[in-house]
Amino acid sequence: MISNSSIEDRINKNEAYIAKFFEIFSKNDKIRFHGVSLDRKALDSFMVRNNFKKRFVSGINLPILIRLHFYKKLFTILWLTVRTVALLSHARNIQCLIQESDGDAKDVARSIYITTAEFRNYLLTEKGFYVTTRSISHFRAILDSIRYPFGKDHASKNMELLPITYDLSFCTVFHGYLTSILEAYEFFRGVFKKYKAPLSSNFIAIGKTTDESNFSQLHHYFQKFDERIRRILHLISQELDGYCRIAKQ
């Protein structure tokens, strides 16, 4: 049975889990993870290069021209910022959506989980990155989402309240990203308090109240959002484990 208390417990557990990542991706030069002392700059370098290696399998999928040493090195430098730019884009989109929460809460919740799904699919792909029209268009979409978080029709929205960073180090960006994720969980916590939980998770459509219908939809959106965030954090945790194994050697 679905209840506000069970959802609250889940949000609390996830917030506690995210708090552990805050300690890792802090602004301290020396941080600790699983008892291992980590150098922040070295961790930054590992996280971006690890992402690069996942997508470029020894250059096999790169065009012949890019396989040449000079062009490959240049392309590598450009690619290293892609994941941090994507993280910034997703974080800002979430914050923009939350700022619109004075509208229909269900629409905001749905938009949050959809933009999270799109970002998760981008982040978790382990296939080689092909320089094709499709991949270039996808990267342009990421950049456009930073300039126009609500779409180009909403380009006049006030963006002054959004955090902007010129430090594209992974640790700094991911720390800010976690802040946006916590704000999203807080948004869901506040929204659920406004709606009545159904008496049963298996209630039939006929005769159900508006509150029950709203609660059911919101719970669906929250579950989808939560699943995707946990997949993203699991991926980062795996990469951290890999770095710790190297640091111990």
UniProtKB/Swiss-Prot annotation:
Principal location: cytoplasm
One cellular component (GO) term of this entry: nucleus
Taxonomic superkingdom: Eukaryota
Keyword tags: Cytoplasm, Nucleus
Keyword Cytoplasm found: yes
Compartments reported by the entry: Cytoplasm; Nucleus, Nucleolus
Protein name: Uncharacterized protein P35G2.04c
Organism of provenance: Schizosaccharomyces pombe (strain 972 / ATCC 24843)
Lineage: Eukaryota, Fungi, Dikarya, Ascomycota, Taphrinomycotina
